[in-house]
Amino acid sequence: MLKYAIIFAIISLIAGALGFTGVAAGSAAIAKVLFVVFLVLAVLFVVLALLGIGAARKAIK
């Protein structure tokens, strides 16, 4: 589960970088939405991993 948190964090950073560098005006709005969505997912998966819920329990043991 921690693997997914890292993946979501990387995706959010890439989406933000592509949207805020002026690649295209339309991609900035999409990047903002994707950044928020994947950032929330990354934080959620980190919290779940710290609590030992789901697949993170097996990864820790």
Swiss-Prot record:
Keywords: Cell membrane, Membrane, Transmembrane, Transmembrane helix. GO terms for cellular component: plasma membrane. InterPro entries: DUF1328. Pfam families: DUF1328 (PF07043). It comes from the Bacteria. It is a multi-pass membrane protein. It is found in: Cell membrane. Its main location: membrane. This is UPF0391 membrane protein Ajs_0703. It comes from Acidovorax sp. (strain JS42). The lineage of its organism: Bacteria, Pseudomonadati, Pseudomonadota, Betaproteobacteria, Burkholderiales.
